[in-house]
């Protein structure tokens, strides 16, 4: 909702800290893990099913980045991993890789009886994701794994603080995701971010936190829209695609929309839309809410 780009390592190194306000939505990724004990499948083979199917004998040969880094880290014996999600998530801007990564860490650690708390999973998740996406920031991993509407502060020493915000605030809206139909590479966009311009995003976080605490809906919506305008100025790639520019203009003109912004690094994915809680007109947008649990783990 506010502060995106200040969670990037380069920004934190330059300015000492970064901060965001975010929430996990109730669109999930799922990892199911199966260990063959009866020999019905190959006992010495790793099987991964996602948009592709992989069958390998060594983890180093796994093409799926998430499956490979997690299984290698835990030195996990051969298992079957199945990846599922509620929406098509590749290049979506919905932090799907971080969500899958946290779910995979949870599934494998549970399978191996390795006890890990949420913060330990976040620290490991960030370390592992940076092996295949070195520019990834803090907010995706920590935002996916921690519950509710909150402010996260990322410090230069690597520590992260969590401050929960009033849970009922977002009940005053109906929230939607509008797909752009455009997939994008977050790495390309993140590498183009101007950290000097991103500094202007930090004040929005503290002001928005204050508005939420005071239940000031009008101020919250104004800050969200204003921060989106500043966000667009931090990189020419955020709205590089003409279709995105057209959609952005269209959303501004829609009187039912109180505020909107593009999710993720930019240049594709989904727009997040806020409407009044009493809005009842049919829409093609995907309705969302705040996730009751940040991640789900299924162990078979």
Predicted feature locations:
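C-terminal nucleotide
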Residues: 6-13, 22-23, 30-75, 85, ...
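Glycine-centered small-residue motifs that form tight turns
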Residues: 18, 268-269
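Helix-loop-helix module between adjacent transmembrane segments
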Residues: 90-92
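Stable alpha-helical structural segments in soluble proteins, enriched in small hydrophobic residues
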Residues: 99-111
């Amino acid at each position: 909702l506010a502060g995106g780009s200040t969670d990037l390592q380069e920004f934190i190194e330059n300015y000492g800290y970064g901060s965001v306000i975010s929430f996990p939505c109730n669109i999930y990724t799922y990892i199911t893990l199966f260990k063959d004990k009866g020999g019905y499948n190959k006992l010495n083979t790793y099987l991964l099913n996602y948009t592709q199917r992989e069958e390998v004998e060594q983890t180093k040969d796994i093409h799926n980045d998430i499956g490979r880094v997690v299984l290698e880290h835990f030195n996990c014996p051969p298992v079957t991993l199945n990846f599922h999600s509620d929406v098509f998530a590749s290049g979506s801007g919905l932090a799907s890789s971080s969500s899958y990564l946290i779910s995979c860490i949870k599934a494998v650690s549970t399978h191996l009886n390795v006890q890990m708390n949420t913060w330990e999973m976040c620290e490991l998740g960030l370390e592992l994701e940076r092996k295949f996406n070195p520019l990834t920031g803090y907010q995706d991993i920590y935002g996916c794994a921690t519950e509710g509407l909150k402010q996260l502060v990322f410090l230069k020493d690597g520590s992260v603080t969590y401050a929960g915000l009033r849970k009922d605030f977002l009940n005053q809206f109906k929230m939607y995701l509008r797909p752009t139909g455009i997939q994008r590479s977050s790495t390309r966009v993140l590498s183009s971010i101007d950290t000097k311009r991103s500094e202007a995003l930090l004040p929005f976080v503290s002001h928005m936190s204050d508005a939420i605490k005071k239940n000031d809906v009008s101020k919250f919506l104004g800050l969200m829209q204003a921060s989106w305008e500043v966000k667009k100025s931090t990189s020419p790639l955020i709205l590089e695609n003409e279709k995105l520019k057209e959609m952005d203009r269209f959303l501004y003109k829609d009187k039912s929309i109180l505020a909107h912004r593009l999710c993720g690094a930019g240049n594709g994915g989904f727009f997040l839309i806020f409407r009044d809680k009493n809005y009842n007109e049919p829409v093609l947008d995907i309705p969302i809410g705040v996730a009751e649990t940040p991640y789900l783990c299924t162990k078979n």
